[in-house]
Curated annotation (Swiss-Prot):
UniProt keyword annotations, A-Z: ATP-binding, Chaperone, Cytoplasm, Nucleotide-binding
Name of the molecule in the record: T-complex protein 1 subunit alpha
GO cellular component: cytoplasm
Subcellular localization, as worded in the UniProt entry: Cytoplasm
TM regions (residue ranges): none
InterPro entries: Chap_CCT_alpha, Chaperone_TCP-1, Chaperonin_TCP-1_CS, Cpn60/GroEL/TCP-1, GroEL-like_apical_dom_sf, GROEL-like_equatorial_sf, TCP-1-like_intermed_sf, TCP-1_chaperonin
Function according to Swiss-Prot or TrEMBL: Molecular chaperone; assists the folding of proteins upon ATP hydrolysis. Known to play a role, in vitro, in the folding of actin and tubulin.
Family: Belongs to the TCP-1 chaperonin family.
One Pfam assignment: Cpn60_TCP1
Any one GO molecular function term: ATP hydrolysis activity
PANTHER family tied to this protein: CHAPERONIN
Length: 545
């Protein structure tokens, strides 16, 4: 016990606790790995239900207390943000590395030796993947990109219509391509807006050219199409100005009340006029628009849209070269509207898409935009569809920007495992043991893929190892490096033929993130947990009554 009133755990005990927590976490998500993985139903404290098999979403919704387990949660979230795919794999790999390291340390191998061996193994694994497993996606053309997207959504709900959604993800990102970047074209994910609409089947989801807003014009009398639109993005309400609460006005003549009301209306009209005089013919605001303001817009044939989402206005402002304005007041307190803050687009129109009226912005000045309308039976369905499609968009973005892909279906992990086993034998130091355990941990991914498919994992992984061993030892069989698990036919197959590809950056980052997380936890030899401070009781007054 510490003098601070906390608890201290050190040595082997804390290491065992951390490894157990990590393995327990991995056991929870491992059944959701792969194209035939299962979903999880999570119910929060207020009864909201989430059904998903996305590793990052599952771990984010869990109430985690153990500090080592929190590291794995952050690991999955980092992988989700950086790549979009591989969140479950990275947690399973980190847990396997920890479990194998714990076995080594139990056999009196020093943790520092294990850590050095893991770092060396990770470096060699990344080098091998980049030099021997990577493939230029341009050689496969658009079909290669579609296969990458299909692989990313193979374990998701939208796999039922994978052909349509993979094509949609690729078309959406290619539609928002922005050339002229320092490293070539860039593909901003935020330029693709995803809208959800209940009803119909998911096969009726569609891709729209332009940025779609789930809003309508404030009045039926406003035009439905504005050509050569100049757009004002406002983060405040356009309503009649009223004096704030607490302001008292003393009048001697009741007729002066009408003058006050008239001045309030004039202030509102002046604000509207400043916006219109700047050239704006489309006004989008996050707040409300009252009838008085609406009247002024209708008179000049302008379109006004209220209650827009702030994030949508930010994205649209970026695409059109405009700026989101939070107030008309300048630094000196005067109300002005700068015309340079207007966005420009070829057309803004209100159209009926599916069962809803939407505002669609086409031909923005700075960079193009696209929107995807998702249809589904209920909230759970469309929410999971959105998560799945977002992951697929991120994966395709990474491939488009890096141009490099690797075979999926456990091919990379098995090839690296065989390579590291042989590499470990070339070392005469104790790190050889750690590298061999790292190689064994790599097989946790193909084994789990086979287990989730309900097939004999031992036989299938042994056959896959045989293929990759021959590819590395026999030059005439080098093409075997493309072989992975074909879980639909319960056999091994050429990933090029079955179209299973993943981004190179996904594999590299998964390896690095999992290794660093395992090393971070292995370096811990002391856990000091302080007790919560009791809050003073303030039920009574200062005298204690």
């Amino acid at each position: 016990m510490l003098t601070l009133g906390g608890e201290r755990t050190s040595g082997e005990s804390v290491r065992k606790q951390n490894v157990l927590a990590a393995c327990s976490f991995a056991n929870f998500v491992k059944t959701s790995l792969g194209p035939v993985g299962l979903d999880k139903m999570l119910v929060d404290d207020v009864g909201d239900v989430t059904i998903t098999n996305d590793g990052a979403t599952i771990l984010k919704l869990l109430d985690v207390e153990h500090p080592a387990a929190k590291i794995l949660v952050q690991l999955a979230q980092l992988q989700d943000e950086e790549v979009g795919d591989g969140t479950t794999s990275v947690v399973i790999l980190a847990a396997a590395l920890l479990k194998n390291a714990d076995e080594l340390i139990s056999r009196f191998v020093h943790p520092t030796t294990v850590i050095n061996g893991y770092r060396l193994a990770c470096r060699e694994a990344c080098k091998y993947i980049q030099e021997h497993m990577a493939y230029d996606v341009n050689k496969l053309g658009k079909a290669g990109l579609i296969n990458v997207a299909r692989t990313a959504m193979s374990s998701k709900l939208i796999n039922l219509d994978a052909d349509m959604f993979s094509q949609m993800a690729v078309d959406a990102l290619m539609a928002v391509e922005v050339s002229g970047g320092p490293k070539g074209p860039v593909y901003p994910i935020k330029a693709v807006n995803i809208l959800k609409a209940h009803g119909r089947s998911m096969s009726e989801s569609m891709l729209i050219d332009g940025y779609a807003l789930n809003c309508t014009a404030a009045s039926q009398q406003m035009p439905r199409i504005i050509k050569k639109a100049k757009i004002a993005f406002l983060d405040f309400s356009l309503q009649k100005v009223k004096m704030k609460l607490g302001v008292q006005v003393v009048v001697k003549d009741p007729a002066q009340l009408e003058a006050i009301r008239q001045r309030e209306a004039d202030i509102t009209k002046e604000r509207i006029q400043k916006i219109l005089n700047a050239g704006a013919n489309v006004i989008l605001t996050t707040g409300g628009i009252d009838d008085l303001c609406m009247k002024y817009f209708v008179e000049v044939n302008a379109m006004a849209v209220r209650r827009c989402k702030k994030v949508d206005l930010k994205n649209m402002a970026k695409a059109t070269g405009g700026q989101l304005i939070v107030s008309l007041a300048d630094m000196e307190g005067d109300e002005v509207f700068d015309p340079t803050k207007l966005g420009n687009a070829e057309e803004v129109s209100q159209e009926r898409i599916c069962d809803d009226e939407l505002i669609i912005l086409r031909g923005p000045k700075v960079h193009p935009s696209a929107s995807i309308i998702l249809r589904g039976a209920n909230d759970f369905y469309v929410d999971e569809m959105e998560r799945s499609l977002h992951d697929a968009l991120l994966v395709v973005k990474r491939v488009l920007e890096s141009k490099r892909i690797v075979p999926g279906a456990g091919a990379c992990e098995t090839a690296v495992s065989i390579y590291l086993e042989n590499y470990a034998l070339t070392l005469s130091s104790r790190e050889q043991l750690a590298i061999a355990e790292f190689a064994r941990a790599m097989l946790s991914i193909p084994k789990q893929l086979a287990v989730n498919a309900g097939v004999d994992s031992t036989e299938l992984v042994a056959r896959l190892r045989s293929c990759h061993n021959s590819s590395q030892s026999k030059p005439d069989q080098a093409h075997n490096k493309w072989w992975g698990l074909d879980l639909n036919n319960q056999y091994v197959a050429d990933c090029k033929e079955i179209g299973v590809f993943e981004p190179l950056v996904s594999k590299i980052k998964s390896l690095k993130f999992a290794t660093e997380a395992a090393i971070t936890i292995l370096r811990i030899d002391d856990l000091i947990k302080l007790k919560e401070e009791k809050q003073p009781d303030h039920d009574g007054d200062e005298c204690g009554y």
